[in-house]
Amino acid sequence: MAELTTLARPYAKAAFEYAQAHQQLADWSAALGVLAAVSQDDTVRQLLKEPQLTSSAKAQSLIDVCGDKLNAPAQNFVRTVAENKRLELLPTIAEMYEQLKAEQEKSVEVEVTSAFTLSKEQQDKLAKALSARLSREVRLHASEDASLIGGVIIRAGDLVIDGSVRGKLAKLAEALKS
């Protein structure tokens, strides 16, 4: 995973810097999202692994599958990535691009897993509190996991806050063992 990140970082940065310079952050976000989704399709994945195909043929196939969702600079980006035999990195590149974009926009994706369904009011209150703590605009994604017993687990980038009953019981059990 760390190796993929290391290899993908320069491509994500290059795409981000180009998009930022041309005020096309949203367009590039959409294009990279499409490329990531298409490249994860089983049929396309097999095509990209085909040793008989040249890099330019693989790039053109990917561009053809994406159709008009890629503008000329995005198509050139695909060709460059293909020339360097890095098409398998497209999902990681897209993910890293989104992180750079979120950093630029001072926003953060927050995943909240709770034991029970959170009401809209609870989600809004939690988003507001996290926004104040993180000094960023928070985009909250809520999910449910009954195995937590109670409470919530909040994930925002590298930050993890485990306020679940399951987490507290695990800590208590660990303390009793030592």
From Swiss-Prot:
Biological processes per GO annotation: proton motive force-driven ATP synthesis
UniProt-listed Pfam families: OSCP
Mode of membrane association: Peripheral membrane protein
Stored SUPFAM superfamilies: N-terminal domain of the delta subunit of the F1F0-ATP synthase
Keyword annotations: ATP synthesis, Cell inner membrane, Cell membrane, CF(1), Hydrogen ion transport, Ion transport, Membrane, Transport
GO cellular component, one term: proton-transporting ATP synthase complex
Gene Ontology MF annotations: proton-transporting ATP synthase activity, rotational mechanism
Compartments in which it is found: Cell inner membrane
Quaternary assembly: F-type ATPases have 2 components, F(1) - the catalytic core - and F(0) - the membrane proton channel. F(1) has five subunits: alpha(3), beta(3), gamma(1), delta(1), epsilon(1). F(0) has three main subunits: a(1), b(2) and c(10-14). The alpha and beta chains form an alternating ring which encloses part of the gamma chain. F(1) is attached to F(0) by a central stalk formed by the gamma and epsilon chains, while a peripheral stalk is formed by the delta and b chains.
Described function: F(1)F(0) ATP synthase produces ATP from ADP in the presence of a proton or sodium gradient. F-type ATPases consist of two structural domains, F(1) containing the extramembraneous catalytic core and F(0) containing the membrane proton channel, linked together by a central stalk and a peripheral stalk. During catalysis, ATP synthesis in the catalytic domain of F(1) is coupled via a rotary mechanism of the central stalk subunits to proton translocation. This protein is part of the stalk that links CF(0) to CF(1). It either transmits conformational changes from CF(0) to CF(1) or is implicated in proton conduction.
Protein name (record): ATP synthase subunit delta
Record lineage: Bacteria, Pseudomonadati, Pseudomonadota, Gammaproteobacteria, Pseudomonadales
Gene name, Swiss-Prot/TrEMBL: atpH
